[in-house]
Regions:
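Amphipathic alpha-helical packing segments from all-alpha helical-bundle domains
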Residues: 114-139, 145-153
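A secondary-structure capping/hinge motif
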Residues: 59-61, 111
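Short hydrophobic/aromatic patch on the recognition helix
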Residues: 46-55
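Hydrophobic alpha-helical connector segments
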Residues: 71-108
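C-terminal peripheral helix-coil segments that are non-catalytic and often amphipathic
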Residues: 2, 133, 137, 168-186
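Basic, helix-initiating cap at the start of DNA-binding domains
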Residues: 1-30, 34-46, 63, 72
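Hydrophobic/aromatic residues within well-ordered alpha-helical segments
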Residues: 15, 65, 69, 86, ...
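Amphipathic C-terminal alpha-helical segment
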Residues: 122-123, 152-170, 181-186
Length: 186
């Protein structure tokens, strides 16, 4: 029974990846607005109905790692080693994200399309909320605590600044050193 579940989950992951890869290739090649979801489904050899079982919208095809990114942010806080601060754990996580930053071509695609920019903004707001909730839980603060929300917002905003810098690792170290000196838990 376990093998069947494993195979089924593996097949679902392969289908999801095939859809996301086909979509990105077509969007980069021809432009987001010029590609329909039927073309993406055909390129991945699935039906449009199947496409929408995996992705709720055309925009979601571009952000196929949305849930993974959020889960990793929360895990960075909850799964940090004993004795490591939340800020230090987030610094390490943001550095890992920076090292696997999206390509310039991908970023241009997002910036060129209002629907994708809006989706990305809403996605990062969801991640910010989840991260703030995780920080609050770890700090013993009530959900919605403004300092936890501010830390989450600052950390996620810093990601963009770090990726845009010519020396991302150095930029991250400087930003998080400032944060570490200034942000204290009470």
């Amino acid at each position: 029974m376990t093998e069947v579940i494993g195979r089924r989950e593996r097949k679902k992951a392969q289908t999801r990846k095939a859809l996301a890869d086909a979509a990105l290739e077509l969007f980069l090649e021809r432009g987001y607005e010029k590609v329909g979801v039927k073309e993406v489904a055909d390129a991945a050899d699935v039906s449009v109905t199947t496409l929408f079982k995996y992705f709720p919208s055309k925009e979601a095809l571009v952000f196929d790692r949305d849930e993974d990114i959020e889960a990793a942010l929360v895990l960075a806080v909850h799964g940090r080693p004993p004795g490591h601060s939340v800020v230090d754990a987030l610094r390490k996580h943001i550095l890992r994200l920076t090292e696997s930053a999206p390509s310039d071509e991908f970023l241009r695609l997002i910036e060129s399309e209002p629907a994708l920019r809006d989706y990305a903004r809403r996605m990062w707001m969801r991640h910010e909320t989840a991260l703030a909730r995780a920080i609050a839980k770890e700090m013993g603060a009530p959900e919605g605590d403004v300092t936890c929300a501010a830390l989450a917002r600052f950390v996620l905003a810093s990601r963009e600044l770090i990726q845009a810098d010519k020396h991302p690792r150095r930029a991250a170290e400087k930003i998080f050193a400032c944060l570490q000196r200034g942000w204290r838990t009470e």
